[in-house]
Design a protein with these regions (language model features):
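Short N-terminal helix-initiation segments at or just after the protein's N-terminus
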Residues: 29-40, 74, 129-139, 254-257, ...
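Short gly/ser-rich anion-binding loops that grip negatively charged ligand groups
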Residues: 32, 47, 65, 86, ...
Length: 346
């Protein structure tokens, strides 16, 4: 019944009732198709339901007028209203590469294939890179959170953007745009967003701080990050330019080396299991020349079993506990599972 309500609401995103009806039929039939998920495969099954002209459906995505942004907003409202009852909505983000080797494929480029690459060997793949923003939801009978994609953006390389006169945007900048759109749709909700080091940039930290009423960023940190205290208050009558940073603090790796022993915790880890870890944590203002300071809480995680590498994480909300930061970052593996399941499904 809820799925029918969603399909009916999608009709408001089209310019003509017939377009809405065909889209609803197409999407509903696509859920039932087995084998290749192509337009032709959907139409073969749909032809058993009602007589149709195949060219009419092929033109749905190229000639008919419908708003993808409106579709995304309707789906986001449907998912968040039903599955995210808590005050803080957990979001995860990542990118995935969809292979397309054709000569006339728009925005095709060579991208690193995260699935087949390792730390010592890089595999490249030609196709599209999609930046994906997903929400984590808990469903009855499922042993882990599900990452449901809400918004996607196509990453275009510098050559494509230059040819089209478009300003080049990095993956992090595209993700900032997706998060900004989501915050406009839900001005009264707060989002906790976790992603890997591609999105743990100083720029994204500043973005999260500007929207700190609605957004918290959790990501990987730099072991030798430059941390400082807040600059002292300027005394009246002082000459010269105001200070932009205070006294230098120890780098995270230096703090770990000096303390030697951290606090023991049992936390939820990748894959939904539990793991005994040793953590070190502190706060400081992350500095980048010309960009200013951003206050963060960093956490160093050391696996006591010795099976995982040491990880440095951070949060733009300094009141978050080390356990919350670790478990929030560990939840991002669910979007990788979503990518894997989508590839198998398609």
């Amino acid at each position: 019944r809820d799925f029918r309500l969603l399909l009916d609401s999608l009709s408001s995103a089209t310019a003509h009732p017939d377009t809405a009806r065909r889209l609803i039929l197409f999407f509903a039939t696509a859920c039932l198709v087995t084998g290749d998920r192509t337009v032709s495969a959907v139409l073969r099954l749909l032809s058993l339901i009602e007589p149709l002209n195949p060219s009419t459906y092929h033109r749905l995505f190229s000639h008919r007028r419908w708003c993808a942004n409106r579709f995304a907003k309707l789906i986001a409202n449907f998912v968040i209203d039903r599955f995210s009852s808590s005050d803080d909505i957990r979001m995860v983000g990542d990118e995935t590469v969809d292979g397309h080797r054709g000569k006339k494929v728009y925005a095709k480029a060579r991208h690193r294939d995260a699935v087949r690459s390792s730390h010592s060997h890089t595999v490249y793949r030609y196709g599209h890179k999609w930046v994906v923003l997903a929400v984590l939801v808990e469903l009855p009978g499922v042993g882990r959170p599900l990452a449901l994609p809400l918004l996607v953006a196509l990453y275009r390389d510098q050559q494509t953007n230059l040819a089209e006169g478009r300003r080049h945007k990095t993956q992090a900048q595209l993700m900032c745009g997706l998060l900004a759109r989501l915050m406009r749709w839900f001005p009264e909700r707060k989002f906790v967003f976790a992603a890997d080091n591609a999105y743990g940039t100083h720029q994204m930290c500043r973005f999260a701080k500007r929207h700190q009423r609605q957004l918290v960023l959790v990501s990987k940190f730099i072991a030798d990050a430059n941390l400082y205290k807040r600059p002292p208050r300027r005394k009246p009558g002082t000459n010269g330019r105001p200070r932009v940073k205070g006294e230098a603090l120890l780098k995270p790796c230096e703090v770990v080396e000096r303390r030697r022993r951290g606090k023991g915790l049992n936390v939820r880890w990748y894959g939904g299991g539990w793991r005994n870890v040793e953590v070190f944590t502190a706060t400081g203002h992350w500095f980048k020349s010309g960009k200013g300071l951003v206050e963060v809480r960093w956490v160093m995680v050391r696996d006591r079993d010795g099976t995982h590498r040491d990880e440095y994480l951070f949060s733009t909300h300094i009141s978050m506990s080390p356990t919350e930061i670790i478990e929030m970052y560990g939840g991002r593996w669910n979007i990788e599972t979503t990518f894997q399941e989508l590839r198998e499904h398609l």
